[in-house]
Amino acid sequence: MIKKIAFVLLVAFMTAGAVHAKPKKRVVYMFGVSASFTDSIAYITDVQRMDPVYIESKTGFLYDRSIYSQQLQTFMEEKMGRPHTTCTIFFSKKKRKLESKYLKVIKFHKKRNSLNIRQMETGAFKFVPEEWTEHETI
């Protein structure tokens, strides 16, 4: 009897790991940084509210993060005339936490004199929420 219960529990634990967590629609806050390895100027967007975006329920990761950095990169190429930039996004569910990170990024680069950070005008660039589609995993 104990062997049967142990077997059932073992099978339950093994299949639980194979099930993917469903994404949750959440409000998050986000900003982006665009920098080039060949230039000393980097651009930083304002902190923006994103509603809704999809968050991985187990890890808290933002689905399709690369799409948002691609949006910023496309903007930098087409509107700002700055090709070949590397774009990074930062996000948080809490606005205060992200604003703190925003200030740390600016302070870090000013302190090191590594990049001249230029803040984009409010509303110059807007992230567009992406519709989540389930990706097939192998």
Question: Which residue stretches match the model-derived regions?
Answer:
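A short linear-motif detector with a strong N-terminal bias
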Residues: 11-12, 67-70, 95-97, 106
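Tryptophan-paired
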Residues: 62-78, 83
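N-terminal secretory signal peptides
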Residues: 21-69
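Surface-exposed, polar helix/loop patches in the mature regions of secreted/periplasmic/lumenal proteins
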Residues: 81-138
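Bacterial Sec-dependent N-terminal signal peptides
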Residues: 1-23
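Intrinsically disordered, low-complexity boundary segments flanking structured domains
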Residues: 18-21, 73-78, 104-105
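N-terminal start-of-chain detector that recognizes signal peptides
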Residues: 2-4, 60-63, 90
